[in-house]
């Protein structure tokens, strides 16, 4: 323990010796204006931005030890600067304001770790022009008498600027250059300019804007000038310098015949021109009175002293004098004004309307509507009168009510006139619009102040005439009824209205047009219904249209059109062409059965097909929409068919049902016998194949045959025409053609189809070419005209003899048509046809006959 104490004591003595041997650091003193050193006599502008590097502390240590810098401030002041301890850079951290603090005391220190050297420095804050002038002792108000002499001092303003130098100097000037006032630019004294005057009556208050401006200076590196403004209010004080003034001139008064003595006629008003301090005013009449009028000296009211009937003149020119009385009671300023008083007759009679029996304020008249334009309402006997005289008896007349219907004559009346009312708009006088027209006849005086007026009611009762046509509420009426509606059924009700009254407003209805035969209309109600015997059929005629006429008793009418549509009812079942039909089916090709529903619209005429019974039941399928029947997919040969139904000779019977889609639905059945063969059998005969292809369209076969015949005819015509032109150009005389007459009864020429033969008991229909007789030299009235004539022979070749003229050749025409052969036993064909061919021909005949019947029904 004792050894440790001795070691610590030795270490302390060693440190003391070393400290006495180490010299303290010191600052460099670089003089005034230097930005580094010990901040001696350092100054800084007050507009220096915060964060600026303003100075660098600089010093050294004799031993070369590292040194550090510090700056501190009195606790009662702001810490304006901060220092980098290593490099000595001093930064401004607070804004400077010279007006608040013009110098800053700080303690700077330098240390080498063992020795610390501190110095007290004073930093001067230099001025910048950052303050604006400021007026003191505001607001500024001055009271100035209006008679103050020009150049007199009115007021003094004072402004201070806390800046120093030019930035703290203040000069004054006025913002309004045309002001009657002026200001001394250095002292701020306000004066009334030379030659200027103040007038209380013209302007009681003046507002002077004074601007204080400093001398300018630098701020943040730029030259700036600050200014301030203030307003000086100068109130002008009134003085007695104005004469009295009359208000409301000129003055006119009127005295009427019933004015009583002592009545006030008019009142004059005057006031002191000096309104700030007005004097008392007295009124008096100077001349022109003649004792007829007097005036109240304090109020200025002029009154009449005599009865108007005693006055000698119609117009009096009075002169009223007003006098100011000073506060001492002595007369001061005076003024005079003329007053004109006119004695006039009393307008005491308003205009009055008179009828045949005296004064009347209501006039009535009955008249027909739509009178001629310009017609005078002679039933009105109206007189208007004003008993006053002269201008008092002049008044205007006008009609008050619906405008533009009537006009009144005369429009301006003097004393008395007969009133005439004339029709101006005949169309507006309509009984249907208004049964009663009411007007007011107004008479108003024109040139009188009273504007007396009077009114009289004019009531016009309109009488109806037949001036309207019955009018339907619609131009078209559309109705729909079912086709099975019984006779007498209601269809639609039409309505027409005639605005006229009485018998003229009664409407009677009737119908006309091609479609009106099946319908009737009630003449009074307009209800359209079917004839009791009418039977409607949508399949025959689905739509009707006709016209309805609405007519009044004088024959004025209007027309509307009616459209009636029959709604289809399912009243026709589907119908097959025959109840028993025969078809030939080639393997792989369907046959078709068809039923027709004569209903007019869908779905009543849409037919669905089904097989109700078949023997056997597993052989055929049918398309329910088209009626096509085909073998089931599993049957592809006659052998397969024989395996299913052994013992049958490829002839099957089906019961096919055709059912429409109406409600309720109808159906029909037909027995279909189908003979099935294969394509190999048909391939042996091209014509049979062709007939198989056209079995559902017999017109195709007819078309092919007709085309063949047309080709033959065309070739014949071409050959005849060529021969004719050759003979004509050869200039040869040919013998005249003979006239061919018909033979008594030649056998008809037919083209027989030898390879068609029917195995059934019914004979197949044959087609033959029927030639029409030539247009010339034929006896068309012959009973044998149905027989085909022989074709004329071609002309002989031309001879070599010269021709004296062109021979007129007549080329006969040949026409052909397909007609069925007469019902006589057909000759035996040279060859026998197959059963399929016979069946196809039978089916082709049936369809051809059905198509012919359909076409005849259509045409």
Curated annotation (Swiss-Prot):
Cite the Cadherin domain residue spans from the record.
36-135, 136-246, 247-353, 359-472, 473-576, 573-688
Q: Does the keyword Transmembrane helix apply?
A: yes
Q: Kindly state which keywords UniProt assigns to this record, in alphabetical order.
A: Calcium, Cell adhesion, Cell membrane, Cone-rod dystrophy, Glycoprotein, Membrane, Receptor, Repeat, Signal, Transmembrane, Transmembrane helix
Q: Which GO terms describe its cellular component?
A: photoreceptor outer segment membrane; plasma membrane
Q: Which residues are glycosylated?
A: 58, 89, 296
Topology check: give the Extracellular ranges. 20-700
- Mark out the compositionally biased spans (Low complexity): 775-791
**Compartmental location:** Cell membrane
Q: Which Pfam families match?
A: Cadherin (PF00028)
- Stretches the record annotates as Disordered: 770-838
Q: Provide the record's note on post-translational modification.
A: Undergoes proteolytic cleavage; produces a soluble 95 kDa N-terminal fragment and a 25 kDa cell-associated C-terminal fragment.
Question: Do the record's keywords include Lyase?
Answer: no
Q: Where is the signal peptide?
A: 1-19
The record's GO molecular-function terms, alphabetically, read: calcium ion binding
PROSITE patterns referenced in this protein's UniProt entry, alphabetically: CADHERIN_1, CADHERIN_2
Question: What happens when you mutate residue 716 to S?
Answer: Found in a patient with Joubert syndrome; uncertain significance
Q: How does it assemble?
A: Interacts with PROM1.
Q: What does this protein do?
A: Potential calcium-dependent cell-adhesion protein. May be required for the structural integrity of the outer segment (OS) of photoreceptor cells.
This protein is called Cadherin-related family member 1
